Amino acid sequence: MAGHSKWANIQYRKGAQDAKRGKLFTRLIREITVAARLEGGDPATSPRLRTAIDKAFAANMPKDNIERAIKRGTGDLEGVAYEEVRYEGYGPYGVAVMVDCMTDNRNRTVAEIRHVFSKWGGNLGTDGSVAYLFSKKGIISYSKESNEDAIMEVAIEGGAEDVVTNEDSSIDVFTEPEEFSTVKKALDEAGLKAEQAEITQHASTSVSLALEEARKMLDFLDALEELDDVQQVYSNADFSEEILAQLG
């Protein structure tokens, strides 16, 4: 099965943007704190916390920061009580967008989200207005240099739902959320190191964009991601490899 890389289409420059804004640690700390609050402070029994910790280590977050975030979540240390909230709507060109936030003030957050949607010609919708276009999936991604046969064999045996080879020869392993940790562990133990791995939202349909449309869409997504309360932005925009190359 071939396709456009999920990471290329949704997050191809997200890492660089996070680093530039200095927001990555803040997002990871909030995710660790909320995961620990909801599922407890033991990563062995909390797949969400385990994933958040893995991402924090990959970002070179100091161990002390991770431990403090866990303790804030479990209540062993005082901290801000964040709640999770999701906003949905349509961005430019009819692209469906979901925005996951962690906030201590819903009124502030929704006002900021609505302002960005309006500024870029989009419309913030009601709960469920675009969620039906997305499904929660575990996605484990590998570079084009990876061993496709080995990944496919281990992933399928480990319980993966699908293995997709993209147009650029990168590989995405899809899992149901509850199977994500098991599949990732099997791949890790087989020595197959992933470039990216997380439970995310995968669009069932996509909207193809021309060059200038793609440029505007990416600026819109960046504007959302720059908001302090935003943790993650999902869209069903589809940028071709050619468009990504031109955007640089």
Curated annotation (Swiss-Prot):
One of its GO terms (molecular function) is DNA binding. SUPFAM superfamilies: YebC-like. Gene3D superfamilies: 1.10.10.200, 3.30.70.980. Pfam families: TACO1_YebC_N, Transcrip_reg. GO terms for biological process: regulation of DNA-templated transcription. It is found in: Cytoplasm. One of its GO terms (cellular component) is cytosol. NCBIfam families: PRK00110.1 (NF001030), PRK12378.1 (NF009044), YebC/PmpR family DNA-binding transcriptional regulator (TIGR01033). Belongs to the TACO1 family. HAMAP family: Transcrip_reg_TACO1. This is Probable transcriptional regulatory protein Noc_0137. It comes from Nitrosococcus oceani (strain ATCC 19707 / BCRC 17464 / JCM 30415 / NCIMB 11848 / C-107).
